[in-house]
């Protein structure tokens, strides 16, 4: 199961882990299928750490799940922030997942069991390189020039009716 994020700087193909994180993947894939993420900017970009998106308001404070409320974390001892390109839900503490997610630029073991890992980049690491190079506001880590998710291709959706 995979999706491709088509961004202003290139494509990123992500494998999603539906068996280990079914609720998170159901939410993510439904948001992808409904074009929820289309036009979202990468609003937080910290070199060597991660890049974050998934907030339609572009502020880093917005975004909802498909259920209209925050939902619980899905941790697995098998899913770690152990390589470049891990995809996780962003949150504001335990069980506060909505629509925002981030992609790591490297190993981030301090995030394990605090953020739900639900995917990994399987193609497009060069696009991740381009994102990491973007100049940012040094206080807010927001890229100086907006980079958007233009649209998303779903390659196979096990939750589709």
From Swiss-Prot:
InterPro entries reported in the protein's UniProt record: Cyclophilin-like_dom_sf (IPR029000), Cyclophilin-type_PPIase (IPR024936), Cyclophilin-type_PPIase_CS (IPR020892), Cyclophilin-type_PPIase_dom (IPR002130), Cyclophilin_A-like (IPR044666)
Keyword Acetylation in record: yes
Sequence intervals crossing the membrane: none
SUPFAM superfamilies named in the record: Cyclophilin-like
Keywords: Acetylation, Isomerase, Methylation, mRNA processing, mRNA splicing, Rotamase, Spliceosome
PROSITE patterns: CSA_PPIASE_1, CSA_PPIASE_2
Assembly information from the UniProt record: Identified in the spliceosome C complex.
Name of this protein: Peptidyl-prolyl cis-trans isomerase-like 3
Species per Swiss-Prot/TrEMBL record: Homo sapiens
């Amino acid at each position: 199961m995979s999706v491709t994020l088509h961004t202003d700087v290139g494509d990123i193909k992500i494998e999603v882990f539906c068996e280990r994180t079914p609720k998170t993947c159901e939410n993510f894939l439904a948001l992808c299928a409904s074009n929820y993420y289309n036009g979202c900017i990468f609003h937080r970009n910290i070199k060597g750490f991660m890049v974050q998106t998934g907030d339609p308001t572009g502020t880093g404070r917005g975004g909802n799940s498909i259920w209209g409320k925050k939902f619980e974390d899905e941790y697995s001892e098998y899913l770690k922030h152990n390589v470049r390109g891990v995809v996780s839900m962003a949150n504001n503490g335990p069980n506060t997942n909505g629509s925002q997610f981030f992609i790591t630029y490297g190993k981030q073991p301090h995030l394990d069991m605090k953020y739900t890992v639900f995917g990994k980049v399987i193609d497009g690491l060069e696009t991740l390189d381009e994102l990491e190079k973007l100049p940012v506001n040094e206080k807010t880590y927001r890229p100086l020039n907006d980079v958007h998710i233009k649209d998303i291709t779903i390659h196979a959706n096990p939750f589709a009716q």
